[in-house]
Swiss-Prot record:
This protein's UniProt keywords: GTP-binding, Nucleotide-binding, Nucleus, Ribosome biogenesis
Species lineage: Eukaryota, Fungi, Dikarya, Ascomycota, Pezizomycotina
Major localization listed first in the record, in broad terms: nucleus
Superkingdom classification of source: Eukaryota
Protein name: Nucleolar GTP-binding protein 2
Amino acid sequence: MGTGKKEKSRIQRQGKVTGDPKVKGENFYRSAKKIKALNVLKEGKAIRNKEGKVVKAASYQSRDVPTAVIEPNRRWFNNTRVISQDTLTSFREAIAEKDKDPYSVLLKSNKLPMSLIRDGPKDALKKHQAKMTIESEPFSQTFGPKAQRKRPKLSFNTIGDLTEHSEKSMDTYQARLEEIKLLSGASGYGGGLADDDVQEEDFSVATAKEAIFTKGQSKRIWNELYKVIDSSDVILHVIDARDPLGTRCRHVEKYLATEAPHKHLIFVLNKIDLVPSKTAAAWIRVLQKDHPTCAMRSSIKNPFGRGSLIDLLRQFSILHKDRKQISVGLVGYPNVGKSSIINALRGKPVAKVAPIPGETKVWQYVTLMRRIYLIDCPGIVPPNQNDTPQDLLLRGVVRVENVDNPEQYIPAVLNKVKPHHMERTYELKGWKDHIHFLEMLARKGGRLLKGGEPDVDGVAKMVLNDFMRGKIPWFTPAPEKEEGETDTMEGREGRYGEMSKKRKRDEDDSAPATTPASAGEDAKEEDPENFAGFDSDSDSEVEEAAEEKGEEKSTAEDMIPLDASSDEEEDGEEEGSDVEDDEEGSDLDIEGASELEESESEAEAAPAPPPKKQRRSRK
Ligand SMILES: Nc1nc2c(ncn2[C@@H]2O[C@H](COP(=O)(O)OP(=O)(O)OP(=O)(O)O)[C@@H](O)[C@H]2O)c(=O)[nH]1
């Protein structure tokens, strides 16, 4: 016997005609619904009185709720797990420990009850209590003569007072705005800012700054940053090894921790060839407490740390196997070497590198491997009221040629660099103050103005450039070691580092070395394997020379605007990059945005992320 359909066709086939509905097949079995309906009929009809009114309703007509005990069952609450308080506590502790550890990654955190872990029982209780207070406080306690709640102190009682107050504060605000505009050089809007731009600026800073000291703070640059962060799965925060705290951008760290905790943040301590290896190691120790940290010397010919960084990125790409590719964004202060890292990783000049800040104008994509894309971001400077122009200048944020009275920053340079390093670098001795130093230097180099006056301004700019480009050795010592930490700064006296013996020997024997290569020798001496120093024809030197000659610097020849349709270009013939030999494949391409829509001078001190839909996303 088959199913209804089969049975029907069998009957038809055999030519049997049957009127018997009981034959197995269609309608043979009664459904549960039908059985229920039949049972209702069995239970009898309603009892009616003589007049035909219902005295006792039939069971199917009754509206009484039947008394029944339902056995409780955990399965009612779908997808729940019941665990004891102890298990919850130990789970909470274990996960919180993993969550804090920068070296472990919590994948699929959305499947874990993270609110239980993050808020903790006490916080949750407090929140609940606060809510309850608001909800349960009776009207009489809140308002009226017996009110217990404190009244807010308002300086006005009527709506008229309020209007007057707001008008007054608007007037003072405008007056203050005018005053700051005058002080900041944007007076009469002759500072090159359009009327609207000036309106947009946040002049809440306590001290007026020259416009050039707001570089890297414009709304456009911060929009670029948020675009890069949005599009990246891994963020490489590039830090200058000479001033790790100064070039550490805590704003980005905080933003990632609160807004995008699923993105991986890695510190890359760049330019380690310019600091002694022990200092680099000490800073790595400090930084890696917060996030995984890699050390880099970004040179195409002689890089350091390239292999381990590529390995790390590969691990992240394996971690996100489900994705077609991962994007790695490089962010950080201007001139810390973001583009140089990209070039070092690729093993050839693909991104524009220059010894001047603000060379990268817009974000650009570079393919490292088939599954790993790199995104270069323009240098950003988090606005900080405590940062003086001097701090910003010495961090390399500002282009020295644009600075007025550069000699005013020389005392800070002399303060940061050990005197004998200055003496060796410039072969000078016995200056009384910074002006005397500049005059001596100008006379020595024959940099004289009309009438034999020393060109103090020009020499001061040269010294500032030498300071920023690593020609003058300097670095910030790492904080004191904690108990149990082995690496020390022994043998180094004072606040700032000593030159290595080898460098001293070299310089005794020959002319003073004033190149980054020589600064790199410090590290080389201490750890010859790791810190081989830049070659004499290193990037910075080549570029500097090119800059002096007015030549074009190394750039990506084939910069394609981001919006351009060619998303992936095959470029498998390049040499010198073992990245290309990656088993993943070798489709290498570069994309860059060439158009620069807005002027960078539009400084805005509030780098809040724009709404996501406004950011230009590549995805
Ligand atoms: N000595 C040394 N110099 C480096 C290193 N990395 C970069 N530089 C130099 O630092 C300067 C700035 O490098 P860039 O790669 O242009 O820096 P950036 O962060 O991209 O700068 P922006 O375009 O302003 O964002 C260049 O002169 C590089 O040669 C390094 O590891 N060691």
